[in-house]
């Protein structure tokens, strides 16, 4: 039996360090894909870098739980990760990013999707509330209002980020975390449709 290896990083938690909050994406794809899924890979790398920088600068307290960043090989890699995990019940949530780089020019819509009713959790509620906040702040900024959190990159576009909040949406690596063997709640961040997929 062979060994499965993939890129991973972690921000160690404090009092609940043995519990994980995962951020996942898939690192590879059979065809070139800046959006599918280099965008998800870069997004979780940037989340890791930003959180660690804020912690190092004492602008954000170290999290209670460990935040683990995973770059496995598509669905098969996620299955292997869970199957070989010492105790998957320690994974308290999974936030998956697959195709998060679309823009209005590609006619894609950013979506924040929750999990199935069979894996009840407040995770989707939190994700949807953050999404509504971002929608509100970026829309008001685009309309010329002075807002506390413009949430735009200086070198980026000034159009609002208008995410859709959805229930369960399948079709990526996050599916296996919801599966009955593991029943790990989570969010799926993605854009769809994508005119240029594969």
Regions found by a protein language model. Name each.
Residues 1-35, 45-59, 66:
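Soluble metallo-hydrolase cores and metallopeptidase-like ectodomains found primarily
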């Amino acid at each position: 039996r062979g060994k499965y290896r993939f890129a991973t990083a972690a921000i160690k938690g404090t009092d609940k360090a043995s519990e994980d909050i995962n951020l996942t994406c898939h690192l590879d794809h059979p065809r070139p894909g800046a959006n599918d899924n280099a965008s998800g890979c870069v997004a979780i790398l940037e989340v890791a870098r930003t959180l660690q920088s804020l912690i190092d600068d004492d602008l954000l307290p170290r999290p209670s739980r460990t935040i683990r960043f995973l770059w496995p090989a598509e669905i098969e890699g996620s299955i292997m990760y869970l199957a070989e995990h010492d105790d998957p019940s320690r994974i308290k949530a999974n936030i998956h990013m697959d195709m998060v780089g679309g823009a209005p020019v590609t006619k894609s819509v950013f979506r924040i999707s929750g999990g199935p009713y069979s894996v009840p959790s407040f995770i989707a509620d939190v994700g949807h509330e953050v999404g509504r906040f971002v929608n509100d702040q970026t829309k008001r900024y685009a309309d010329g209002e002075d807002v506390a959190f413009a949430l735009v990159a200086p070198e980026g576009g000034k159009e609002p980020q208008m995410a859709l909040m959805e229930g369960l949406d399948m079709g990526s690596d996050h599916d296996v975390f919801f599966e009955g063997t593991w029943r790990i709640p989570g969010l799926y961040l993605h854009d769809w449709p994508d005119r240029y997929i594969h």
